[in-house]
Amino acid sequence: MGKLFGTDGVRGIVNKELTPELVLKLSKAIGTFFGKNSKILVGRDVRAGGDMLVKIVEGGLLSVGVEVYDGGMAPTPALQYAVKTLGYDGGVVITASHNPAPYNGIKVVDKDGIEIRREKENEIEDLFFTERFNTIEWSSLTTEVKREDRVISTYVNGILSHVDIEKIKKKNYKVLIDPANSVGALSTPLVARALGCKIYTINGNLDPLFSARQPEPTFDSLKETAEVVKTLKVDLGVAHDGDADRAIFIDSEGRVQWGDRSGTLLSYWASVKNPKAIKKIVTAVSSSSLVEEYLSKYNIQVDWTKVGSVDIAHKVADENALAGFEENGGFMYPPHQYVRDGAMSFALMLELLANENVSSAELFDRLPKYYLVKTKVDLKPGLMVEEIYKKILEVYSTSSVKAITIDGVKIIGKDFWFLVRKSGTEPIIRIMAEAKDENVANNLVNELKKIVEGK
């Protein structure tokens, strides 16, 4: 049987890999999985092809007897929160998150707002490939798609209920918001305004082509945003990806702070806010060693897991963990919801700053200093990924390092770590290394790239 779902949903280039025919068939499988008369919320980000795909999905769902509600354009976490709080049986989000502009995708959400478990993905794939759809009789096709207008307001109010609004308001923070010309522009400024912030925006208009910057917030794509933070002398900058489930922060000195750094600080803050919670967080093997180094001071256990928000979210929920996060800026705060949420992360960071009464630069300087270097190699036909992993283990495994092989190969040394893994969303192999010496990090990445390329 074939495979549709990757690390985070079904993705592909619109009209090439993610064709109308495939999406119609997939939506019929999704609707059959949820069952006749189930209530399903459909929404999307700003991407090209989004409106086309929404209409196809809604048509496919209607054809198998599902009651369909259209939530319009909204951040993925807003749609997930609406599914959970407004009584839906599930949701379908049209998004490719951080992928380049030509991509779009389908994310399936369960009634708890979390992306469906891997076993349920397999069930939908089985229905898709065997074409066992619960197609209804023509005489039952009398319902229309209904409009759901409460998505954004419900979401923003939910976020605000988890932070001390008055404490943040007293600080009169100046913030810069970079929503990547996508749906983060529809919600994060509303959160900032409610928290009494003076708001600046960059890349704030909706643009399906992501003309100003790539939808993935990286060190390179945020160079201009970081310069604006310094020029305007704001207290905090926040940048989202295409569907605003991530938040990458830029501190008051204009330094881009990667997601495992912000996730570490927010995990500490979650433990302060929820003193009775289990002192455990869940993060992917792609996160830095600084996570354990810092959180161990507060007796917070770190549970490493595979890369992918689906796996992390369900592990956080199953283990009743304090929080979960990825190094890419996706942070999960369980009192709100068990999914990545960019605007919730932003509100929590402002609350942490207000509580600590320090600048954002001073706050991030509390963390151990590591230098991060990343690259990627195209996954060419015939490239044997498992053989690459085996070679890396042969070269780098010694008694003085720790090897983790639950998702690619991660090696942790005294003052460095690296990860090599096949991407679950793109045909590439990702290489990342961190070290307390920048030259060590650069050398590691160069060495690993040669091994991956077979040189």
From Swiss-Prot:
Mg(2+) binds at residues 97, 241, 243, 245. The modification Phosphoserine is found at residue 97. Binds 1 Mg(2+) ion per subunit. Activated by phosphorylation. PROSITE patterns: PGM_PMM. One of its GO terms (molecular function) is magnesium ion binding. InterPro entries: A-D-PHexomutase_a/b/a-I (IPR005844), A-D-PHexomutase_a/b/a-I/II/III (IPR016055), A-D-PHexomutase_a/b/a-II (IPR005845), A-D-PHexomutase_a/b/a-III (IPR005846), A-D-PHexomutase_C (IPR005843), A-D-PHexomutase_C_sf (IPR036900), A-D-PHexomutase_CS (IPR016066), Alpha-D-phosphohexomutase_SF (IPR005841). One of its GO terms (biological process) is carbohydrate metabolic process. Pfam families: PGM_PMM_I, PGM_PMM_II, PGM_PMM_III, PGM_PMM_IV. Keywords: Isomerase, Magnesium, Metal-binding, Phosphoprotein. It is an enzyme of class 5 (isomerase). It catalyses: alpha-D-glucosamine 1-phosphate = D-glucosamine 6-phosphate; D-galactosamine 6-phosphate = alpha-D-galactosamine 1-phosphate. The active site is at 97 (phosphoserine intermediate). Its EC number is 5.4.2.10, 5.4.2.13. Its cofactor is Mg(2+). Involved in the synthesis of UDP-N-acetylglucosamine (UDP-GlcNAc) and UDP-N-acetylgalactosamine (UDP-GalNAc). Catalyzes the conversion of glucosamine-6-phosphate to glucosamine-1-phosphate and of galactosamine-6-phosphate to galactosamine-1-phosphate. Belongs to the phosphohexose mutase family. This is Phosphoglucosamine/phosphogalactosamine mutase. It comes from Sulfurisphaera tokodaii (strain DSM 16993 / JCM 10545 / NBRC 100140 / 7) (Sulfolobus tokodaii).
